[in-house]
Amino acid sequence: MKDKMSVFAETVLRQKYAQDGETWADVAHRVVKTVYKSVSAPKSLVEQTTQYVIERKFIPGGRYLYATGRPYHQVNNCLLMRAEDSREGWADHLQKCSMGLMTGAGIGTDYSSIRSEGKLIRKTGGFATGPCALMQILNEAGRFIMQGGSRRSALWAGLKWSHSDIQKFIHMKDWIPEVRALKARDFNFPATMDGTNISVQLDDDFFTAFNKEDSLAEQVYWSTVERGLKTGEPWFTVDCGKNKHETLRNACTELTSADDSDICNIGSIHLARITDLEEMKSVLGCAIPFLLAGTVYSDVPYAKVDTIRTKNRRLGLGLMGIHEWLLVHGKKYGVDADLDKYLEIYATSTDVAKQFAKEWDLSAPVKTRAIAPTGTIGIIGETTTGIEPIFCAAYKRRYLKGHIWNYQYVLDPTAKRLIEREGVNPEDIEDAYVLAEDVERRLAFQAHVQKYVDHSISSTINLPQWGSELNNKDTVQKFGKTLMKYLPHLRGVTAYPDGARDGQPLTPVSWKTAVKHVGEVFVESMDICELKGGSSCGS
């Protein structure tokens, strides 16, 4: 496969990750050589890993590409936090989150332990303001703290389904028409929780209650589904069985933990560039030790993070290019026996990690696999992101250059290859909008892949706009029943109706329009903020 990058991939590389005019090969050498020095890796491993990165068969997470070699090198991504229910706990949480954001981490917080709004505070005689208040304080901090001084802060908030304030939480983003209009004109206009992704947390008790037709469980479920179908949030995270204590998540929700101040550490294998099963084993055998070395190399924002990282040493090796792999092999998006052979090798990462941890005298990682949404590294890899289908054959993508928002017309690289090499009609490519008519296929596939993943999968189901034929008040029950069929087998689910938020980063356009303008860069008429349509973790 040719290694020459497209103009758009080169633009993203140059503006987000390259240091001092580096080429992609330069970035690969800088990142791999520097990270492996922390564990005295053998020369053969360094050279082979570097070659796989150059060939884009394995791409480390965005923090590795950006921060490796800098004086402060926090290459592990998001912090996974738990907010404690006390004045000291609130202050400590805000301080740690600020430290994390300023050094490059996204923040995911479980707020379920905070007492509900209106509860009596015995020491002062006052009343609690509840978890939603603390979420909003952190949301406003994130508005003014550029993550690592270079990008918009990434935040996630979760609240348990049985919390007394759950309905307030579910409706936090029900912005009044006046606010929506102002944000349509200027997306920097502040609105409640506009910089935070939110999820309702489900557990074994929820599913037991729902199956017994418990009124609270049903009310929470259906109100969440309807809000999600209308506005894109909130949706669900799922923590059941052996994972029941892992309620903490990173900002994109694919990493999970039970321990406050845990940290995620991600990179992805580009499945569509892997030639066969033997090469899959070889790439895996380089990706895992690289991420393991990253747990030694990376700086952290405060001491507890290092303590928890040493205890858990979580790795988040993901996959991307799954839909491209299926397309190249003439297969439809969905469960496939040949794909499973690659997933089975992927699942051996636990044993590979234990082997290298023993060789390097490190604690063995408690878990090793998490499929991130691979936003910008998916662009660099020029493939389909995570487990996502092709978004669409051609689209307009907005991105930040300094403090100014630009956009370019993009020909999806997978679609482009199929159209140019195989003569496929652009209108015949099965994309996210086609699959919006078959939500069950999307959910069934995610549930199947989850069997091979010990953390979680961050994936967004694209849906038609609320009020359209396939997404309206009459389709809520059908969607909700289909979702419930698969929800116990997932670790989380997200869906996004087209146009739910003004200023969304990806907008479908015609193939003809994109071809006409490809390679051109346009400047937005106003400075507006990017929503999550790829990895807010820079993965």
Where are these regions (language model features)?
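A structural-propensity feature for long, helix-poor, extended segments
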Residues: S116-L155, I274-D299, H403-Q446, D454
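Internal maturation/activation junctions in enzymes
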Residues: C286-D306, T310, G321, L326-T374, ...
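A glycine-rich phosphate-binding loop feature that marks nucleotide/adenosyl-phosphate handling sites
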Residues: Y52, Y66, Y111-E117, A157-I166, ...
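Acidic/polar, glycine-rich intrinsically disordered N-terminal extensions of enzymes
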Residues: M1-V75, M81, K481, P488, ...
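Extended active-site and interfacial segments that coordinate phosphate-rich ligands
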Residues: A91-M99, R115, F127-N139, K173-F189, ...
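Function-dense linear segments that define catalytic or interfacial modules
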Residues: R14, Q19, T34-A41, T50-K123, ...
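Conserved, charged catalytic cores of large soluble enzymes
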Residues: M1-E47, K123-I137, Q147-H245, L319-K354
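Catalytic alpha/beta core of large soluble enzyme barrels
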Residues: K4, L248-D260, G267, L291-V296, ...
